[in-house]
Swiss-Prot record:
UniProt KW keywords: Amino-acid biosynthesis, Aromatic amino acid biosynthesis, Stress response, Transferase
Induction line: By amino acid starvation.
Organism per entry: Saccharomyces cerevisiae (strain ATCC 204508 / S288c) (Baker's yeast)
Originating gene: ARO3
Molecular functions (GO terms): 3-deoxy-7-phosphoheptulonate synthase activity
Miscellaneous comment as given in the Swiss-Prot or TrEMBL entry: Present with 8970 molecules/cell in log phase SD medium.
Any Pfam family: DAHP_synth_1
GO biological process, one term: chorismate biosynthetic process
InterPro entries, per the entry: Aldolase_TIM, DAHP1/KDSA, DAHP_synth_1
Protein name per UniProt: Phospho-2-dehydro-3-deoxyheptonate aldolase, phenylalanine-inhibited
Keyword field contains Amino-acid biosynthesis: yes
Keyword Amino-acid biosynthesis tagged: yes
Activity control, per UniProt: Inhibited by phenyalanine.
Length: 370
């Protein structure tokens, strides 16, 4: 029910004259009550959270793999992808902790489709309550198959969905944001900060240090009431190398430089793994076909015994490439299992990359024993 603002456009008003109106938001606890997580899903979530923490702290020598579509727009295709991923996850479970990338919102440099929550019908109708409902219903089904990861783009939607995540990420555009650092300090799962869009590491290092401390800030409670939130701090953080305007940073030299800077900041030591490499974005030069090449470089580093790497991030889908959303008709006419945001590698390539990285982990074990 959209409540129109009759004073929109009236410049003599002190506030809200640029606001068209309001649509009441479903309270988080109501949506969570309507779509509760099953016992199996809860077990999967907590087990994966604990495993990620063990990997970050050197107690588990596997590699975390955050892999999946750039963004989810079709629940049916998401279930299909999850079923496929769950099978290979079980096969490679001794070497890889596979977590499905389940991003719902798309940060934009300018404009464009912002994601399933913001515009679920993909027709600029912005039915956000519907988007939250579809997303939560999808998530509680996904977590019964395997753990999922999400990107924290704002400070309100996590109240609806964060109980489903085993891992989270803060993107390059928001790593420098104080709000997102405060949010990360109170999240119940490990969180990764990406380097800046220019490729600089300092913003991510500063974010990790800030998130480790307690904070007090304004937020929204489960019943939907605004409140002052106090957090304990989150030390389960890591840095995601995603490349930038100044070039890639997945190579051996870049990893060693990152390791030194993290050690200098007191954020890691010889027993910890705090670096994840994003095979997409700046590291792929925005060409999805380069992702396997980045994975091969990671494989080579693992084979040499590189022990600072905690994980890898890959954009993958059932079908490779990407597609535009039709200007008319919304999601009608879209190709099944193909991204509508960033281009992804297809399933065949996905399996090959995962097998390669699993072999890399086995090689790392051998190298470190010598």
């Amino acid at each position: 029910m959209f409540i129109k603002n009759d004073h929109a456009g009236d410049r003599k008003r002190l506030e809200d004259w640029r606001i068209k109106g309001y649509d009441p938001l479903t309270p988080p606890d109501l949506l969570q009550h309507e779509f509760p997580i099953s016992a199996k899903g809860e077990e999967n979530i907590i087990k994966a959270r604990d495993s990620v923490c063990d990997i970050l702290n050197g107690k588990d020598d596997r590699l975390v793999i955050v892999i999946g579509p750039c963004s989810l727009h079709d629940p049916k295709a998401a279930y299909d992808y999850a079923d496929r991923l769950a099978k290979i996850s079980e096969k490679l479970s001794k070497d890889l902790l596979i977590i499905m990338r389940a991003y719902l919102e798309k940060p934009r440099t300018t404009v464009g489709w912002k994601g399933l929550i913001n515009d679920p019908d993909m027709n600029n109708s912005f039915q956000i309550n519907k988007g939250l409902r579809i997303s939560r219903e999808m998530f509680i089904k996904l977590v019964e198959k395997l753990p999922i990861a999400g990107e924290m783009l704002d400070t309100i939607s996590p109240q609806f969905l964060s109980d489903c995540f085993s891992l989270g990420a803060i993107g390059a555009r928001t790593t420098e944001s104080q709000l997102h650092r405060e949010l990360a300090s109170g999240l119940s799962f490990p969180i990764g900060f990406k380097n800046g869009t220019d490729g600089g590491l300092q913003v991510a290092i500063d974010a990790m240090r800030a998130a480790a401390h307690e904070h007090y800030f304004l937020s929204v409670t489960k019943p939907g009431v605004t409140a002052i939130v106090g957090t304990e701090g989150n030390k389960d953080t890591f840095l995601i190398l995603r490349g930038g305007k100044n070039g890639t940073n997945f190579d051996k030299e870049s990893v060693q430089n990152t390791k030194k800077q993290l050690e200098k900041a007191g954020l890691t030591d010889d027993s910890q793994k705090r670096i994840m490499i994003d095979c997409s974005h700046g590291n792929s030069n925005k060409d999805f076909k380069n992702q396997p090449k980045v994975a091969k470089c990671i494989y080579d580093q693992l084979t040499e015994g590189e022990n600072s790497l905690c994980g890898v991030m890959i954009e993958s889908n059932i079908n490779e490439g990407r597609q535009d959303i039709p200007k008319e008709g919304g999601r009608e006419g879209l190709k099944y299992g193909c991204s509508v945001t960033d281009a992804c590698i297809g399933w065949e390539s996905t399996e090959q990359v995962l097998e390669l990285l699993a072999e890399g982990v086995r090689n790392r074990r051998k190298a470190l024993k010598k």
